[in-house]
Swiss-Prot record:
It comes from Homo sapiens. Its main location: nucleus. There is a cross-link at K25, K284 (Glycyl lysine isopeptide (Lys-Gly) (interchain with G-Cter in SUMO2)). It is found in: Nucleus. This is Zinc finger MYM-type protein 1. GO terms for molecular function: protein dimerization activity; zinc ion binding. Keywords: Isopeptide bond, Metal-binding, Nucleus, Repeat, Ubl conjugation, Zinc, Zinc-finger.
């Protein structure tokens, strides 16, 4: 109710207000001022003010304020004198002070201190009392409204309330369906169509598993259960997400979309990294889905822009309504009046000391505003309805121009800041459907599922065709924002990432951005996704060709990695930049092969080289290759009847202790039995205790799928420092499987015996030290090394490079022979170089070395070492053979021992002595002096004939006797003692028992031994009848020399005569014997790859980064199998499947 004004006061008020009308500014100077003026008018129009009151010291004087009607007639309100009272705000209850302006609502006597107080008071008065909320999960009352989490789940129309995120997660786990994509081709009955077909999806919902055979059945299942279908509306492809539920979280009056409760927790964090573009994706991840909202408010999902365009074109062609009518209807709808919910303010009360004439405020309703929008085919237009926060009678109209075929070079977006004062119907142009373009509906809204929802609008601009509406009131480049951020690195381009709100020199910034490389790339990418009939019709064929091309290129990548791994070459180079002359083995080989494959492959290489050259992608491919190779080995192991493990210790470049694990097993073929020793990989060992090592080895073998019930042997590096640890490992394995015999490494024991032999005799140790100094001096000078090779014909093969390595002493016979035969010439060369050298220190070193090699003692020790090592070298080479077995090894060890024992007499010593004197005579003929041996009279020598008799202690009477006792006899006794110690401390009982049963068919059968073997190995049948048959059959049919019989040759006889099915128990014993590891040579071979694989090692890498390349370098036979077309296709498919799961 308006209060009436007195006649005289009304005239004064009218005169005072009309006098200030001329001071009102009616036209803005620029667009920014115009925008500010429009916003001010809108705010004033929402609050209609009617009267103003003024309070003096003694009374409240009512001022004047007009509510101007549409006719423009102003009515004056009289001043009303009142008694001085204390006034407070009806909203916030604050006391109104002197000079403060108060506001009064129309039809109400309550006063307010500000407009927000009025709005808040109206909202609290009009809104109903909040009802009592209950948590949908725990059923507890939610006392604090701020703790309420309202979530609209996908299969319900109403919202569910929760008291906390934990309750939301618990509720979600109870009811959400789990969708699993099936990769195995298993025929099962479909839960929807009831047909027996290959199942594509498994959906677990409410503890019930549903098998679905196709995308159509999946869509029906979702529809039947009222789920939001994550399926393409056009092609039906399932667009998978980490959770099949979609949540809408209401916070602060806004709707936020999340795919799970975990996403709600991670709200306002940085967005996830974009997925790597992977070729041949039959399934689309959710962040590549396109969500559109139709006119009716229905949400539709599409797997690609092409699917969206095809669906939109088909929908438009089927509709009988033209685009012009659509735009007209939309404009009409926007022009329709809305219900005004804005409070109307009746009075403004001024608490001033004196009466001040107030200006008349024009509160006429703002005229309808129209924003003209220009639409092209390059963007999707959103003519969304005005939000409740906009003026109630604001209208929007759209003008549409005929689109162009390609995106415009200038495509920017900005917030619409201006509105026309009248409807611009003259600018409306009819839009026809082009035969070459497929446009989406004008009212569609496009957004990413995981991204923020945003509408895309365009308004007319003189120089720039497209402008996008932004809530931030900033300008964006449409093409760069939509395409470039995901596929290119946009750096600090403001128009693509941050936008710009600084309108100074805006056109200049726009033109500069048009010429940038990022903008041109985004436009080029945009053109590939045009809504054309040709692109839609040829989409399947083009996509199929791209898939095949990408697969061929991926095969090329895998072949390169296999080849480089087989050759033990590093993939990466020191400088892999574009300008580098040598980019590394991988890039150089890839570029060369891509050129040979054709222009298309070369183009793919240039576009995807950074992707496949990344360390992570190469590691993923190597990991898949490693898995394939290990699976092949494990299949062979599990198909065999028995296997043994061979382990050695090593240290990688990160100084971490590792174990090299190999397996030995027999493999039956059509004509023979092959002995396979395969390398399985390196395993880190945190502790070097027996229990921990046993657990580490067993865990690794079980992880890769080895059947541990078939283990029948174990061998380890038996050096002195590791012997105790490996004995504990063997004991742990024998607790679980007593038949896993501990067979020591014979190669290591032979090496230990030779080392002790060379170190325990003083003269031999001194001679080897002099020999090492000689080779070190020769290698120091290239000229000296060339002279030695040319003069004495010492090839690199005859000169052992590892002369100072203890592990190479067993094969020093070749080196010793080279030095012995050429010693006079070596001494002569040293003399010449020492006399002509300008370096005095080097000359002194050569002179000292010349004195040492010219001694009789040095020559004698060389002759003696060669005589011993030349015999033990035969056994050392035999132990490196993978086909060696216990039976043949025992005879060879006995032969070595017999040979060395038989030479412990004066005859063989005299042979060495005479040979030494002959060489010294040759040196003397060259003009050099040889230092003769001297007799050490005070040294006691103990005879070896009777070690317990102290009377045998004597002094040698001659130099020859001294050399015979001190060097020759003592050296032979040392080597014989060590060999007997090493090869006699093992328990050969079980091994010899099987050897006797299989090889000694001409001797009487020992049934007690046979029964013991049967019980120990838990054979299923009685072994005695098989042995009786086998012995008679072998006598009549096996024509073979007893001296060359071994387990391998016996296995060939079993296959030739078909005895495996006749005597299964004996055949099993034969396979067990073939699996026994006599040596860990294969493990040593794996160690030889480490120096060549140093590129793959760094301080942060463990065995996972090393096992893959080492497998390719050691198991080259398996690498060749992986290069077959079928196996390559399997690796390609596994890599693609792995990339989808990222």
């Amino acid at each position: 109710m308006k209060e009436p004004l007195l006649g005289g006061e009304c005239d004064k008020a009218v005169a005072s207000q009309l006098g200030l009308l001329d001071e009102i500014k009616t036209e803005p100077d620029n667009a920014q001022e115009y925008c500010h003026r429009q916003q001010s008018r809108t705010q004033e129009n929402e609050l209609k003010i009617n009267a103003v009151f003024s309070e003096s010291a003694s009374q409240l004087t009512a001022g004047i304020q007009l509510s101007l009607a549409s006719s423009g007639v102003n009515k004056m309100l009289p001043s009303v004198s009142t008694t001085a009272i204390q006034v407070s705000c009806a909203g916030c209850k604050k006391i109104l002070q002197k000079g403060q302006t108060a506001y009064q609502r129309k039809g109400s006597a309550q006063l307010f201190c500000s407009i927000p107080c009025i709005t808040e008071y109206i909202s609290s008065a009009s809104s109903p009392v909040p009802s009592k909320r209950t948590c949908s999960n725990c059923s507890k009352d939610i006392l604090n409204p701020k703790d309420v989490i309202s979530v609209q789940l996908e299969d319900t129309t109403s919202c569910k309330t929760f008291c906390s995120l934990s309750c939301l997660s618990s509720y979600e786990e109870k009811r959400k369906p789990f969708v699993t994509i099936c990769t195995n081709s298993i025929l099962t009955k479909c839960s929807m169509c009831q047909k027996t077909a290959i199942i594509q999806y498994e959906v677990k919902y409410q503890n019930v598993k549903h098998n679905l055979c196709s995308n159509a059945c999946l869509s029906k299942f979702h529809s039947a259960n009222n789920f939001i279908m994550n399926c393409c509306e056009n092609c039906g492809t399932y667009c998978y997400t980490s959770s099949s539920l979609s949540h809408i979280l209401q916070m602060e009056g806004q709707s936020h979309y999340f795919n799970s409760s975990k996403s709600i927790t991670a709200y306002k964090q940085k967005p996830a990294k974009p997925l790597i573009s992977v070729p041949c994706k039959p399934l689309k991840p959710s962040d590549e889905m396109i969500e559109t909202t139709s006119d009716l408010g229905k949400t539709e999902l599409f797997c690609s822009i092409n699917c969206f365009s095809a669906y939109s074109k088909a929908k438009m062609e089927s509709s009988s309504v033209s685009v012009v009518s659509v735009v007209h209807d939309t404009s009409t709808e926007l022009l329709s009046p809305k219900k005004d919910t804005t409070p109307v303010i009746s009075n403004i009360v001024s608490l001033a000391d004196t009466d001040v004439a107030l200006p008349i405020m024009n509160t006429d309703v703002l005229q309808d505003t129209v924003s003209s929008v220009t639409a092209t085919a390059d963007v999707i237009v959103d003519l969304s309805k005005s939000s409740p926060s906009e003026p109630s009678n604001a209208v929007a109209s759209s003008s549409t121009e005929q689109p162009s075929v390609s995106p415009s070079s200038s495509v920017f977006s900005q917030h619409a800041i201006g509105s026309s004062t009248e409807v611009q119907k003259d600018n409306m142009k009819s839009m026809k459907i082009s035969d070459e373009l497929c446009h989406p509906k004008c009212t569609s809204k496009v957004q990413k599922v995981k991204g923020k929802s945003r509408s895309i609008k365009k308004s007319c601009c003189a120089d720039f065709e497209c402008l996008e509406n932004s809530k931030k009131d900033v300008a964006f480049c449409y093409s760069c924002q939509l395409f470039c951020q995901k596929y290119f690195s946009c750096g600090r381009e403001s128009f693509a990432t941050h936008g710009t709100s600084n309108w100074k020199k805006t056109l200049e910034k726009f033109r500069k951005h048009e010429k940038s490389e990022m903008h041109l790339k985004s436009l080029e990418f945009w053109r590939e996704y045009q809504f054309c009939d040709g692109a839609v019709s040829d989409d399947l064929s083009i996509h199929s060709k791209q898939i095949e091309g990408n697969k061929k290129y991926l095969k090329l990548i895998i072949e390169n990695i296999l080849f480089l791994g087989k050759q033990c070459l590093p993939l990466r180079g020191n400088d892999q930049s574009v300008s580098s002359v040598n980019k590394g083995n991988f890039l150089e080989l890839l570029e060369m092969r891509a050129k040979d494959k054709g222009e298309e492959t070369f183009r793919l290489m240039n576009s995807q080289v950074d992707f496949y050259n990344s360390t992570q992608i190469q590691s993923d491919i190597i990991e898949i290759i490693k898995t394939e190779m290990l699976q092949d080995i494990v299949n062979e192991i599990n198909d065999s009847s028995a296997f043994s493990i061979i382990c050695d210790e090593t240290i990688n470049s990160a100084m971490k202790e590792q174990l090299s694990i190999c397996v030995r097993y027999p493999q039956k073929s059509s004509k023979a039995i092959l002995i396979k020793e395969r390398f399985l990989g390196f395993v880190d060992t945190e502790e070097m205790t027996g229990t921990h090592l046993h657990r580490t080895i067993k865990t690794y073998l079980q992880q890769i799928g080895v059947d541990m019930d078939k283990i029948h042997g174990q061998a380890y590096d038996s050096t002195t420092n590791l012997k105790i640890k490996f004995n504990k490992i063997a004991a742990e394995f024998k607790k679980e499987e007593p038949r896993a015999l501990y067979i020591h490494c014979y190669a290591h024991f032979l090496d230990l015996s030779i080392i002790r032999f060379c170190k325990e005799v003083k003269e031999l140790r001194s001679a080897l030290k002099t020999l090492s100094s000689l080779f070190n001096t020769i290698c120091m000078s290239g000229e000296m090394l060339a002279n030695f090779r040319n003069i004495y014909r010492l090839s690199q093969n005859k000169t052992c490079k590892k002369h100072i390595s203890q592990s190479c002493w067993t094969v020093h016979d070749r080196t010793l022979l080279s030095v012995i035969d050429s010693l006079p010439e070596i001494i002569e060369t040293l003399e010449v170089i020492a006399s002509h050298s300008s370096n005095t220190s080097f000359a002194d070193e050569l002179s000292h070395l010349l004195t040492l090699v010219s001694k009789f003692e040095f020559v004698f020790c060389l002759k003696f070492l060669y005589r011993v090592l030349s015999v033990t070298g035969i056994l050392s080479k035999e132990l490196q053979n993978k086909t060696i077995d216990i039976f043949s090894l025992s005879s060879k060890i006995e032969a070595i021992l017999e040979c060395l024992s038989s030479e412990r007499n004066d005859v063989y010593f005299k042979t060495i002595w005479d040979g030494t004197e002959e060489i010294c005579q040759k040196i003397t003929c060259k003009g050099f002096k040889v230092e003769k041996p001297s007799l050490q009279k005070r040294r006691k020598i103990q005879k070896s004939v009777d070690l317990g008799n102290s009377d045998n202690m004597f002094f040698p009477t001659s130099t020859e006797e001294q050399y015979k006792i001190n060097i020759y006899y003592q050296g032979l006794d040392t080597i014989l003692q060590n060999l007997k110690l090493c090869f006699s401390e093992f328990d050969y009982c079980k091994i010899k028992q099987i050897s006797e049963l299989l090889f000694k068919w001409n001797e009487p059968l020992n049934e007690t031994t046979a029964k013991h073997v049967q019980e120990f190995y838990k054979l299923d049948e009685d072994i005695i009848p098989e042995l009786r048959f086998y012995r008679h059959y072998a006598k009549l049919n096996f024509v073979i020399d007893d001296s060359c019989i071994n387990f391998v040759s016996l296995g060939c006889l079993f296959i030739q005569h078909g005895l495996h099915s006749n005597i299964p128990c004996l055949s099993k014993l034969l396979y067990i014997a073939l699996s026994w590891p006599i040596t860990s040579a294969s493990t040593e071979n794996s160690f030889s790859t480490l120096p060549r694989l140093k590129t793959y090692l760094c301080n942060t890498m463990g065995q996972e980064k090393l096992t893959g390349p080492a497998l390719m370098a050691v198991e080259q036979e398996l690498v060749n199998k992986l290069m077959e077309p079928e196996r390559l296709n399997e690796i390609v498919e596994k890599f693609i499947s792995q990339m989808k799961e990222i």
